[in-house]
């Protein structure tokens, strides 16, 4: 991959590099694997919406829950999006993070005996009446219902062009309200396809450092347990809660993604060799298959203000890597200019993103070297779809060119190109 360092930074002195935005835009577009990018793109597959739920069914009602599917089906794949306390005759308002590809949702009033009074409603409906007339099923779920989980995909090369397999770091994150002033955030490292050190953190968007009472983990686990001194050069702070440049609260996830996924104090007598984890179909050479690793963070706030409406959209997970003598952060496109822990020039060019948030707990990330999927003219002038998500009418490449289409692309993997 052509390096941009010498092109976008003009040397003015032995110690100072000046960022050249115009040259950067020329080169990054030249290296792009797509012919065009919709300049309206936000690279979001979800929308945060406020809903009102009117509790008019059952008796002894204690709460209302909202699910992606019917939670009472025996083979349900439902996820809990959000919940709120409510009594019969009352209304509850909730912010929901709704995938654009989701046409319908399910609301359930829950009584003191654990019975669910379930009704379906169109995702575009903002006021939902749950009454004896609208309830379609009553019962108790026969399976445990997980909370809504999103998959986050990162390219390691920001601000340079990547290889667009989006597997340099893959995480799954879910949140649940576990107390009046408490959120529990579950973070799972699924894959590390990078061969260099990456650190990771999670900003609580709009939440100040001083708003947080404590941050701990279930079982006192940490991705930074036993991390060697030699791994502390990208981000050397092992405190679980740190303060961002703008005063916002930031959870320190890990200072070395490879160590976080593979930690074992007795492996190789403390010597640590980086491999690429879970981006191949078998172990061997530089590649290794490993179990995923999860740490659950318990965040206690000083007050409960706004927690009823806390959604996944208020999480800003990002990675940090060294580049051109500095440390650069890779965020979702919506937060690309955030610069939470480090300062650096921020490109404004609208090109392919370096990070994606996919509203799926079981998203299958591309194998190493397999691009996520693009639509491009061949040398013969024929427009072709290719990559790990290339199903016509449901492809990543078509979504790149028109942000209003193919918002369900993540449901259509190419079998031999995904993990």
How should each PLM-predicted stretch be described?
Residues 58-75, 195-233, 238-240, 314-328:
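Extended low-complexity, serine/threonine- and proline-enriched intrinsically disordered segments
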Residues 157, 161-179:
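Low-complexity, acidic Ser/Thr/Pro/Gly-rich terminal tails and inter-domain linkers that flank the onset
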């Amino acid at each position: 991959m052509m390096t941009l360092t010498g092109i976008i930074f003009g040397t003015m002195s032995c110690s100072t590099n000046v960022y050249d935005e115009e040259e950067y835009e020329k080169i990054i577009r030249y290296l792009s694997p797509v012919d065009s990018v919709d300049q309206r793109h936000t690279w979001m597959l979800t929308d945060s919406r406020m809903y009102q739920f009117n509790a008019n069914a059952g008796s002894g009602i204690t709460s209302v829950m909202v699910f992606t599917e019917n939670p009472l089906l025996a083979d349900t794949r439902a996820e809990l999006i959000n919940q709120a306390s409510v009594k019969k005759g009352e209304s509850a308002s909730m912010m929901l993070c709704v995938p654009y590809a989701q046409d319908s949702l399910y609301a359930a009033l829950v009584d003191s005996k654990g019975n669910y009074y379930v009704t379906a409603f169109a995702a575009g409906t903002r006021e939902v009446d749950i009454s004896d007339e609208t309830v379609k099923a009553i019962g108790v779920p026969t399976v445990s219902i997980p909370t809504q989980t999103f998959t986050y995909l990162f390219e390691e090369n920001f601000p340079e062009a990547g290889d667009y397999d989006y597997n340099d770091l893959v995480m799954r994150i879910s949140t649940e309200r576990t107390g009046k002033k408490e959120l529990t955030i579950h973070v799972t490292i699924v894959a590390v396809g990078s061969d260099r050190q990456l650190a990771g953190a999670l900003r609580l968007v709009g939440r100040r450092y001083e708003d947080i009472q404590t941050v701990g983990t279930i079982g006192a686990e940490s991705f930074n347990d036993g991390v060697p001194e030699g791994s502390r050069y990208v981000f050397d702070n092992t405190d679980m809660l740190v303060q961002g440049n703008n005063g916002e609260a930031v959870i320190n996830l890990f200072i070395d993604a490879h160590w976080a996924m593979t930690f074992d104090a007795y492996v190789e007598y403390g010597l640590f060799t980086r491999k690429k984890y879970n981006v191949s179909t078998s172990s061997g050479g530089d590649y290794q298959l490993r179990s995923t690793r999860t740490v659950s963070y318990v965040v206690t706030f000083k007050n409960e203000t706004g927690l009823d409406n806390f959604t996944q959209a208020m999480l800003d997970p990002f990675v940090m890597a060294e580049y051109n003598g500095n440390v650069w952060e890779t965020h979702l496109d919506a937060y690309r200019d955030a610069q939470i822990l480090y300062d650096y020039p921020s490109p404004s060019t609208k090109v392919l993103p370096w990070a994606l948030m996919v509203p799926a707990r079981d998203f299958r990330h591309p194998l190493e070297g397999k691009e996520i999927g693009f639509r491009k003219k061949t040398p013969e002038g024929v427009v072709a779809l290719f990559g790990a998500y290339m199903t016509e009418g449901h492809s990543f490449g078509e979504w790149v060119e028109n942000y209003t289409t193919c918002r369900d692309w993540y449901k259509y993997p190419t079998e031999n190109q995904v993990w």
